[in-house]
Amino acid sequence: MARRQDEARAGVPLRVEGPPDKEVHLILYHWTHSFSSQKVRLVIAEKALKCEEHDVSLPLSEHNEPWFMRLNSAGEVPVLVHGENIICEATQIIDYLEQTFLDERTPRLMPDEGSMYYPRVQHYRELLDSLPMDAYTHGCILHPELTVDSMIPAYATTRIRSQIGNTESELKKLAEENPDLQEAYIAKQKRLKSKLLDHDNVKYLKKILDELEKVLDQVETELQRRNEETPEEGNQPWLCGESFTLADVSLAVTLHRLKFLGFARRNWGHGKRPNLETYYERVLKRKTFNKVLGHVNNILISAVLPTAFRVAKKRAPKVLGSTLVVGLLVGMGYFAFMLFRRRLGSMILALRPRPNYF
């Protein structure tokens, strides 16, 4: 595996080939605040699979670096590596995990196709996965006036908004510096430009937020059905039945992201959609969810400090030695904590020219 990663960095194309070997450990390239990455990480936790995780920092534009673009020409996280197989895009990764690890010790998150629950789970999974989460995310940054109680600090929102325009020029520069990846960089540049034209359109954002409410109405009705089907002494059900399924993965991570963006009160606050509110509160207490995603909405712990540590480690001279480097990291962590409300995030983001969040 190490050899294959060296090849990726050297420009040798990576191939997806051969049957999956369940004995080979999984490697996941992800970013903590990536919505798609969060779904994959929750699935891995629910299935109790051993996985080596590597952060690909979006604030530091590591997903645009040549080695990663050779791993996934779209330049997007997550990416799963399993032996000789490289799987990109969250839905494909989740399907791969569900279809590959079939032993009795590994929990199944999708009912058998002949089961009465299969159509229900498949419907809600597809419905929830069709939501334009990237548009909600970018939209709340570009139009924070549409959010309430957003967990993204105001200074970070301002900083990110001012840097979004730099992404195109960064990709153009990388395309010029890496001729073998020029086509991939140009394609990503075009996709990003097209997205931003929509995401900066406040009418479009209001439209998709209204459509989101219709989807959540369906979910609320389905949760009510589960409550009516369950005897008082029975186990509390999930979205499609007694078992936690891929539909629940999609719903749980969606609600957590909406809470982070500042769309919770609009969609399940003040007694609106009470079943949805109860469901989300229950999800927060689920052991696997709490382990994987319990801290991600705290931007200090999940983004600012890890980025600070990464920058400090990269910039610390090798002659300092490991002990002093660790001391610097601890000191920076304390410094970050004390100055978080005084715009530490802006300082960290400013350490690298032209960062982007896409």
UniProtKB/Swiss-Prot annotation:
Expressed in brain, spinal cord, muscles and intestinal villi. In the central nervous system expressed most prominently in the cortex, cerebellum, thalamus, olfactory bulb, and spinal cord. Expressed also in sciatic nerves and in dorsal root ganglia. It is a multi-pass membrane protein. It comes from the Eukaryota. Ubiquitinated by PRKN during mitophagy, leading to its degradation and enhancement of mitophagy. Deubiquitinated by USP30. SUPFAM superfamilies: GST C-terminal domain-like (SSF47616), Thioredoxin-like (SSF52833). There is a cross-link at residues 50, 172-173, 188, 190, 203, 206-207, 214 (Glycyl lysine isopeptide (Lys-Gly) (interchain with G-Cter in ubiquitin)). Its main location: mitochondrion. The chain crosses the membrane at residues 292-312, 320-340. Induction: Increased expression during neural differentiation. Residues 320-358 are annotated as: Required for mitochondrial localization. Residues 24-105 form the GST N-terminal domain. Gene3D superfamilies: 1.20.1050.10, Glutaredoxin (3.40.30.10). InterPro entries: Glutathione-S-Trfase_C-like (IPR010987), Glutathione-S-Trfase_C_sf (IPR036282), Glutathione_S-Trfase (IPR040079), Glutathione_S-Trfase_N (IPR004045), GST_C_GDAP1 (IPR034336), Thioredoxin-like_sf (IPR036249). One of its GO terms (cellular component) is cytosol. Homodimer. Belongs to the GST superfamily. This is Ganglioside-induced differentiation-associated protein 1. It comes from Mus musculus (Mouse).
